[in-house]
UniProtKB/Swiss-Prot annotation:
Enzyme class: hydrolase
Gene: clpQ
Oligomeric form and interacting partners: A double ring-shaped homohexamer of ClpQ is capped on each side by a ring-shaped ClpY homohexamer. The assembly of the ClpQ/ClpY complex is dependent on binding of ATP.
HAMAP family per the UniProt record, alphabetical: HslV
Residues that coordinate or bind Na(+): 165, 168, 171
Keyword line: Cytoplasm, Hydrolase, Metal-binding, Protease, Serine protease, Sodium
Role description: Protease subunit of a proteasome-like degradation complex.
UniProt record similarity statement: Belongs to the peptidase T1B family. HslV subfamily.
A GO-annotated cellular component: cytoplasm
Source taxon at top rank: Bacteria
GO biological process assignments: proteolysis involved in protein catabolic process
Name of the protein: ATP-dependent protease subunit ClpQ
């Protein structure tokens, strides 16, 4: 078992808070659920940064380690660490073959980092990746827009993942939720 073939990660910045959620399902191949409670969202850099991944397990752990090293190297500068990781990921012969995507965030910044060298900061403070990403993204945008002050970032992150889990067969309801205050 070497791959998270299907996963949903969702991140939102709302009312001065940052939250990220991920489901726990690990699917092997196209038909077998191998695990229900995988932890695909983590706190890094002494709890000041959240990171979530979709993609191959070993590749994602390699990228977590590389990203955390870049955070240390650049004293917690999230944008600089993400750009430097993307540059290395794209240009290194071994890293270039890694199959994963990352969402990283701190209190001020939310970024998507991919192996093609892209570092994308969304306009609306919301990102989602993985098989249920589009469902979570749509739900999260609607919740953020219409819930206004009545929902917290954590509540939006949880509800977006719950919605994705109701629609996407590769997303379950075992939600891991992390928040920065």
């Amino acid at each position: 078992m070497s791959s998270f073939h299907a996963t949903t990660i969702f991140a939102v910045q709302h009312k001065g808070r940052s939250a990220m959620s991920g489901d726990g399902q690990v699917t092997f191949g196209q038909a077998v659920v191998m695990k229900h409670t995988a932890r695909k969202v983590r706190k890094l850099f002494n709890g000041k940064v959240l990171a979530g991944f979709a993609g191959s397990v070993a590749d994602a752990f390699t990228l977590f380690e590389k990203f955390e090293a870049k955070l240390e190297e650049y004293n917690g500068n999230l944008k600089r660490a993400a750009v430097e990781l993307a540059k290395e990921w794209r240009s290194d012969k071994v890293l270039r073959k890694l199959e994963a995507m990352l969402i990283v965030m701190n209190q001020d910044t939310l970024l998507l980092v991919s192996g093609t060298g892209e570092v994308i900061e969304p306009d609306d403070g919301i990102l989602a990746i993985g098989s249920g990403g589009n469902y979570a993204l749509a739900a999260g945008r609607a919740l953020k827009k219409h819930a206004g002050e009545s929902m917290s970032a954590s509540e939006i992150a949880r509800a977006a993942l719950e919605t994705a889990g109701e629609i996407c067969v590769y997303t379950n309801d075992q939600i891991i939720l992390e928040e920065l205050e």
